[in-house]
Amino acid sequence: MGIARTKTIKNKHSAKLANLRNNKSSSSQADGGNFVRAKKSGTGSNKPPLTSQAKGRPSIADLLKKKKKRVYTEKELGVPKLNMITPVGVEKPKGKKKGKVFVDDPESINTILAIVQAEKEGQIESKIMKARQMEEIREARRVEAEKKEAERQAKLEDTKNSLRKKRSRSNKTEDDGVSELAATGSKATKAKKKKVAFA
């Protein structure tokens, strides 16, 4: 046995591989190469090499392939539909035909419907009542405004008439005074006193 040649190692991991190769070559030299391995003849059956996997287990290649994931619909997942308002009584139970049975007991749905109808009718009635009240108030205000306007017009006419009467009276007195002065002339005489004698 001689001294083995050393090689420069560029990679630290390749040192282990080199040691293994050296060991194999030294062991084959130690055996002296006394035996020769028999080569397999090509005339044998062409069977594929057996894999280490059993028949029932999937192979690594099958595992590495990506499986298509199943996509579930919203109906299968039971996701509620958005942007829809459905009353509690009208909601369709799962697994039952649509339009057949909405609620377990029909009395409860009838009471719910009656309550809703009463509320709606009450709202409508209250709106009608409010409209009537507002109409009555408007009518009363209109009548009151007409009455006030009539009173104001009457007062205005009274004041106009009184002013006309005053004017006519003042004109008459002035005319009487002027006529008396014209009749008596320029002489200013005392007015004669009326004497009344009793028998």
Curated annotation (Swiss-Prot):
Protein's cellular compartments: Nucleus, Nucleolus
Keywords: Coiled coil, mRNA transport, Nucleus, Ribosome biogenesis, Transport
Location (main, coarse): nucleus
Residues forming coiled coils: 129-175
Disordered: annotated segments: 1-59, 141-199
Domain of life: Eukaryota
Stretches with biased composition (Polar residues): 20-31, 42-54
Residue spans of biased composition, Basic residues class: 189-199
GO cellular component: nucleolus; preribosome, large subunit precursor
Job description of the protein: Required for efficient assembly and nuclear export of the 60S ribosomal subunit.
Entry protein name: 60S ribosomal subunit assembly/export protein LOC1
Organism, as annotated: Pyricularia oryzae (strain 70-15 / ATCC MYA-4617 / FGSC 8958)
